[in-house]
């Protein structure tokens, strides 16, 4: 880098760009004109129904953030202090923050070459924690960059062990594995 380069403003490189079209603008205006900006209303009800349908699940709840969804999932499953939750190293802070919010301990598991959690390392980590007498009531799996984790490689074993699978599928809405959509592999998911 030269001195001349140091004086240039940094160009921002976005991971992804938001796409807002007339469809989204009309939906916002429709919600504002309906008088149902808060608490919720028909637009949110329709959104929840569409998400549930697309994910092939019975229920979907719109919350303020993916972090809130992960936090709520952990609380609903009774996960808290003294629990150990394996989670991918390749993630956004919200994933591990939600685990910390409930007093549980995140146990980091390295990623495979695709960026998602390494199935073999995940199962080995679970086995090691259980062998040490640790309580592992759940795992939190992160789907990255529009790709689902390799759920068929580990979900059946987790189910055998009675370990809840929680999906952080915020980056994978619309993705699937063998026709099964993101958000439908575990006991709960945040999209």
Predicted regions and their residues:
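Active-site phosphate-binding strand-loop segment of PLP-dependent enzymes
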Residues: 114-191
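Conserved coil-to-alpha-helix start sites within the AMP-binding
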Residues: 91-96
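Phosphate-binding glycine-rich loop
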Residues: 37-84, 98-101, 108, 131, ...
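Short beta-strand->loop structural element characteristic of the AMP-binding/adenylate-forming
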Residues: 87, 105-116
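Solvent-exposed, non-membrane alpha-helical residues enriched in polar/charged side chains
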Residues: 29, 33, 48-52, 71, ...
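Generic structural signal for small/hydrophobic residues in well-ordered secondary structure
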Residues: 28, 51, 69, 85, ...
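N-terminal "arm"/small-domain region of PLP-dependent enzymes with the aminotransferase-like
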Residues: 1-37
